[in-house]
């Protein structure tokens, strides 16, 4: 049962990461000033 809980946690974490990646991509496309620094870092991370 504990192993099953870990699998769910990992899946949820991965989904959250994917959603964050999508949000960053949208923000970067719109060239939001606040996200410029994050976008520069984001380009080096292969999503």
UniProtKB/Swiss-Prot annotation:
One of its GO terms (biological process) is negative regulation of phosphorelay signal transduction system. It is found in: Cell inner membrane. It comes from the Bacteria. The chain crosses the membrane at residues 6-26. InterPro entries: MgrB. Disulfide bonds: none annotated. Keywords: Cell inner membrane, Cell membrane, Membrane, Transmembrane, Transmembrane helix. Its main location: membrane. It is a single-pass membrane protein. Coiled coil: none annotated. HAMAP family: MgrB. Belongs to the MgrB family. PhoP-regulated transcription is redox-sensitive, being activated when the periplasm becomes more reducing. MgrB acts between DsbA/DsbB and PhoP/PhoQ in this pathway. Represses PhoP/PhoQ signaling, possibly by binding to the periplasmic domain of PhoQ, altering its activity and that of downstream effector PhoP. This is PhoP/PhoQ regulator MgrB. The gene is mgrB.
């Amino acid at each position: 049962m504990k192993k099953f809980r870990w699998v769910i946690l990992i899946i949820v974490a991965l989904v959250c990461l994917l959603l964050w990646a999508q949000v960053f991509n949208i923000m970067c496309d719109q060239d939001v000033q606040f996200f410029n620094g994050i976008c520069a870092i984001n380009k080096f991370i292969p999503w």
